[in-house]
Amino acid sequence: MTGFLRSSGHAWLWLLGPLLWLGGLAGPLAAHGQGKYMTKAGYISFFSASIMEDIEAKNTKVAAVFDLSTGQLAFSVPVREFQFKRTLMQEHFNENYMESEKYPKATFTGQLTNAAQVLKLLPSATQNVEVEGQLTLHGVTHKVAVSGTLQLRDNQLVIFAYFNIAPADYAIDVPLLVREHIAKSVSVRVSMACDAVAQTLVSQP
């Protein structure tokens, strides 16, 4: 992941500074700029079909920052904030699968693949987008491609995205007893309404 950020230039410094603050990892924050959007209440869910029982969880504490002028984005997901229907399933998820005390956050940094075209047409209509970036989960980082939409609505940047991941790719160990009864791929959905960042200096305590 370090190499990817380095190759993206200094623009990532603006993105990751606010993201760290939103995720509760940094102190005072100063942000300048136009066309930049943030949220700390993004929504993410995942679903995996299973013969034994479908696995589904939701999280409304996603921190995200999007630089609309460059097409770069980043988000951070607190793993322990995923909510399940069953408490026991949530405990297994955190303790046995995700090891959330050791790996408390999942992160993504990416770039719109067709940024120039999207940014030109975005003010007038919802745009289908493709994002390529680095997803870090359970301490493992992989390059992923994500499909979604962008829309400017009521002074907010509305983001929808969807992609699939394979837990095995991120060294998430599923017990042998249930391995054959759980889908090899997990469907992920993301929904965020990001507020514009004021062009003046923003400082948070």
Where are these regions (language model features)?
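N-terminal secretory signal peptides that target proteins for export/translocation
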Residues: M1-H10
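Intrinsic low-complexity/disordered segments
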Residues: S7, L29-A31
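Bacterial N-terminal signal peptides
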Residues: W12-P28
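Low-complexity, acidic/polar, glycine-enriched regions of mature
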Residues: A31-P205
